[in-house]
Design a protein with these regions (language model features):
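A nucleotide-sugar donor-handling region in carbohydrate enzymes
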Residues: 225-226, 357-410
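Conserved catalytic-core segment of nucleotide-activated headgroup transferases in glycan assembly
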Residues: 255-259, 388-430
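N-terminal nucleotide-binding beta1-loop-alpha1 segment
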Residues: 2-24, 241-246
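Conserved N-terminal segment of class I S-adenosyl-L-methionine
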Residues: 536-635, 644-647, 676, 680-683, ...
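Short phosphate-binding loop-to-helix
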Residues: 59-123, 300-310, 327-328, 435
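Catalytic binding pocket for nucleotide-activated donors in carbohydrate/polymer assembly enzymes
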Residues: 456-500
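Conserved core of the sugar-phosphate nucleotidyltransferase
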Residues: 67, 110-199, 204-215, 230
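S-adenosyl-L-methionine-dependent methyltransferase catalytic module, highlighting the catalytic core
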Residues: 764-772, 782-880
């Protein structure tokens, strides 16, 4: 018991900070609200009840921090810049505190209630036994503090010369358990959100902090309400930040900007403006911003700030970057792809290299002439006006001219004069004369003259007549392809031609413009208007996947397939085809996966199909046995008992990291290592469980291959992430099985064989998986797996359908070429490739029948086998070396 501390402890709070941060220099001086980040940190911490408050900085920062410390009621102390441990020790020697509370100057949202609780707990713990260091684990990153005994830190500094210990403070204590007692107490449930981040370590952190500060109204609050902060941090726009990047290039109008601005308002997203600051904004953009509800905190100005957002990030900072560029240039695509997964709206870009950096292409306005395919065309996202004409226009008396915010080609005045000569009274929409909520005002006019874009389709839906102007060649092409009348400048100078066009529009009541060859009819498009806002929000929550082998964001990877729900890429390094984007929810592999889902696909449940799967397993197990007989000593019984993996028991053969032994399902008999006595008597090979070569089946499901492997002579062991499956394997089949993630399980013995049957494609990270398999196998051990084949008839000749029909939980699609390259990288040599899944009916557009044409059927079957054109294949390989990342 530490009576001196308990009686009247002197507790001081030290905030550590400096301007020389390597990742974000001078971040403590960044504006936050009306003052600075450091102001908010110090103001917040003043509510923690201690004896005295200090700001411990370095000599170079002293002049910048002195006035802030004084204003906030903190005493300033200066010490070495890089030896932070020494800085703290000097202050402790000066003040001689019993207890020190340490916080950092880049955490403006620190939980002061958790800090006060921590002090109380630290004193309680020290009432019974000495605790040198205390902190709460599980708080949002940037919300906690550290507490330690002053004398203990001085002692720790004397004992360590490690640079890391001196660059920080706490490690000098908690990294030396032989000398000091440290307690990491789990956070209370209300604070336990370790995945949330509230610190300011990067420019992106700062931009997020600006939002949090405004939402929490920190300007008017004495300290942070932790529960409110957690609530806000779990809001969609904080958890899934979205960046909108419109085209703001001169001469491209305001349509792209207005769409992004509207979406940013609705989703509380960030808006990038390609200007250095607000003063450089053109008047039309400035007016639109002033009339919007978007916060200044949501604006990001200039390319330099855009670059800073990507700096020092372990992963892409934004959940989604939305491009609205008309035609996305290479530089913009490069920027966007470094910041988050990329969705582009109505993109006229056709260059495959640039499009390869765009994860999802959404075409809302029809663009049939483009030489590229989008993921999805959905004109229902075009906003539909609620106000519509009740009668068709028979005489055009009024017109609205809306050519965009800039009208660089000068159509507005030309059209106004030309239509005026025909007696049509016109109203113009421009920067100086905007019409709020223009979409709902269109029905008031007989004629709308605009360019190809939303307004054209909205006007059509409102019942007005529509004439478009050819602002660009592409706009002209698209307008004509959708059945709109499209005029060039010269047409407005031809009064007779224009008069004839107006007359045609007036007399086409029986054949309204909505009956032209346009791809869509807005009025009849859909009963309910699709929400672009909701689509973008949902898409922001979709995960971007990278090559499961190389596991890196490689913008050189080619996109080989797009559809409404997915994007598929091919790795430029290892040639693996992989799922880049998948919007459809992925199965959780619960019991229904093997029963209802399996039956829907195959007409029977997994257990009803057990014998058929087992028969295939017998063939596979025999191949594995044959390939290994002359190479793996244990297959002949040599040293088998020593190498045998035992069934889990009190002396378990493995322990699971992040798992307890309750995940390990016991085989019914503890007398044998793998088999019950009943099962042992049925073995075909003359090997006892102690001498049988061991086999681990990863993704064993309900155990048909385990049963086949046992009959072949193996001592089988299973693992699966489905608990119902491993329970069945243990209780019904009598084989030991482990429920959980095999990659984080510490198997203390190695196996002679490892198998994965239609499992390997389900792993998102194959690098981890293949390294683990290598470590599980003895040298010369056999690794066998089966998987869908990109080298088969469907993958080669019906690629689009093949990729379209690939299950949503298949992260990779293997080919013979990629298998050879990838397996070699992980220390395996392929011994045999078996092409399977032969389907003669898939060789022709029109399916052939085995019953009606048996000769052709069998001929194609033989061709498929000879040229290995099956839609699945099996790989049998041997471990020839340990991968550098693994340890035997």
């Amino acid at each position: 018991m530490n009576k001196s501390i308990l009686e009247n402890p002197k507790i001081i709070l030290i905030v550590q900070g400096r301007i020389g941060s390597s990742r974000l220099p001078k971040k403590a001086l960044y504006p936050l609200g009306k003052k600075t980040v450091l102001h908010q940190v110090l103001k917040n911490l003043k509510s923690v009840d201690v004896k005295d408050y200090f700001l411990a900085t370095d000599y170079n920062s002293e002049e910048f921090f002195a006035p802030i410390a004084k204003e906030c009621g903190f005493k300033l102390f200066s010490g070495p810049e890089n030896d932070v441990l020494e800085r703290f020790c000097l202050l402790i020697k000066q003040e001689n505190p019993d207890v020190v509370v340490r916080a950092t100057g880049d955490n403006p949202f620190l939980f002061t209630d958790a800090a006060s609780f921590s002090i109380k707990r630290f004193l309680e713990l020290n009432a019974t036994s000495k605790v040198d260091y205390f902190t709460i684990s599980g708080l949002p990153h940037g919300s906690g503090i550290e507490i330690f005994l002053g004398k203990s830190l001085l002692e720790a500094a004397e004992k360590t010369n490690l640079p890391y210990d001196h660059e920080h403070v706490g490690p000098a204590l908690y990294n030396h358990p032989e000398n000091f007692v440290s307690v990491f107490e789990p956070a209370l449930e209300k604070w336990n959100f370790p995945k949330l981040r509230t610190t300011i370590d990067t420019f992106f952190d700062y931009k997020k902090a600006e939002k949090l500060y405004k939402i929490l109204d920190c300007e008017n609050q004495p300290n942070i309400n932790s529960e409110k902060l957690i609530e806000v941090c779990n809001l969609d726009f904080i958890k899934y930040p979205i960046l909108f990047m419109p085209n703001t290039q001169k001469g491209k109008g305001t349509g792209h900007f207005r769409r992004c601005l509207s979406l940013a308002e609705e989703l509380n997203g960030f808006l990038f403006l390609d200007f250095n600051n607000k003063t450089e904004l053109p008047e039309h953009f400035e007016n639109l911003l002033e009339n919007s509800n978007l916060w200044d905190e949501n604006l990001i100005f200039g390319k330099e700030n855009l670059k800073k957002l990507a700096e020092n990030q372990s992963e892409k900072p934004f959940s989604l970057v939305v491009l609205d560029s008309f035609v996305t240039p290479k530089e913009k695509a490069d920027f966007a792809s470094k910041l988050g997964k990329v969705l582009s709206l109505d993109d006229g870009q056709e260059n495959p290299e640039i499009l390869g950096k765009i994860n999802y292409l959404l075409d809302i306005i029809p663009s049939s002439k483009l030489k590229r395919s989008p993921n999805w065309k959905n004109t229902d996202f075009i906003p539909k006006p609620k106000n519509k004409k009740t009668e068709k226009v028979s005489q055009i008396k009024t017109g609205l001219i809306s050519i965009g915010g800039e009208d660089p080609a000068g159509f507005t005045n030309l059209a106004k004069i030309a239509l005026g000569k025909l007696g049509i009274k016109t109203t113009t929409v421009d920067v100086e004369n905007p019409i709020p909520n223009l979409k709902e005002e269109l029905y008031k006019y007989d004629l709308i003259l605009t360019h190809y874009g939303f307004t054209a389709f909205e006007a059509k839906a409102a019942g007005a007549k529509v004439i478009l102007v050819a602002t660009t060649k592409l706009h002209k092409t698209l307008a004509k392809s959708e059945g709109f009348i499209c005029l060039e400048k010269k047409d407005f100078k031809n009064k007779n031609k224009l008069k004839e066009i107006i007359k045609t529009l007036e007399t086409e009541n029986s054949k309204n413009q909505s009956d032209t060859k346009s791809q869509i009819d807005i009025e009849e498009s859909s009963k309910t208007e699709a929400s672009l806002k909701n689509f973008i929000l949902d898409f922001s929550k979709t995960k971007e996947h990278f090559c499961p082998v190389c596991n890196s964001s490689n913008n050189l990877d080619k996109i080989i397939f797009r559809n409404e729900t997915r994007t598929v890429k091919k790795c430029s390094k290892c040639h693996t085809i992989y799922l880049n984007i998948e919007k459809t929810p992925i199965s959780d592999y619960s019991e229904s996966y093997f029963f209802e889902d399996y039956k829907n696909q195959y007409g029977k449940t997994y257990l009803e199909d057990f014998d058929s799967i087992k028969n295939q397993g017998l063939r596979r197990a025999k191949i594995m046995w044959k390939l290994a007989t002359h190479t793996a000593p244990a297959f002949s019984g040599e040293n088998a008992k020593e190498n045998c993996v035992q069934a889990p028991s009190q002396g378990s053969c493995f322990s699971a990291q992040k798992s307890s032994l309750e995940n390990c399902v016991q085989a019914p008999s503890q007398e044998t290592s793998f088999l019950t006595q009943e099962n042992s008597s049925k073995e075909k090979r003359n090997l006892s469980p102690q001498t049988a070569p061991t086999l681990l089946d990863i993704g064993c499901a309900y155990g048909p291959f385990l049963a086949a492997a046992k009959e072949t002579g193996f001592a089988p062991f299973g693992t699966d992430i489905s608990k119902s499956a491993t329970d069945y394997v243990s209780e019904k089949l009598g084989f030991p099985a482990f429920h959980g993630d095999f990659t984080i399980t510490d198997f203390q013995k190695q196996f002679e064989a490892v198998s994965m049957w239609y499992v390997i494609e389900h792993f998102e990270n194959l690098d981890t998986v293949l390294n683990k398999v290598n470590s599980l196998l003895k040298t010369k051990g056999i690794f066998a797996f089966s998987t869908p084949s990109a080298s088969g008839v469907s993958g080669k000749f019906k690629t689009k359908n093949f990729l379209q029909n690939s299950p949503v939980d298949h992260y990779s699609i293997w080919s013979f070429k990629s298998a050879k390259k990838v397996l070699k990288k992980y220390g395996f040599k392929i011994l045999k490739i078996q092409s399977t899944g032969h389907h003669p009916e898939r060789f022709f557009k029109k399916s052939i029948s085995k019953e009606k044409n048996p000769f052709l059927w069998n001929l194609i079957l033989q061709i498929s086998r000879i040229f290995k054109l099956g839609d699945t294949f099996e790989v049998y390989c041997q471990k020839i070396s340990s991968n550098p990342k693994t340890k035997n």
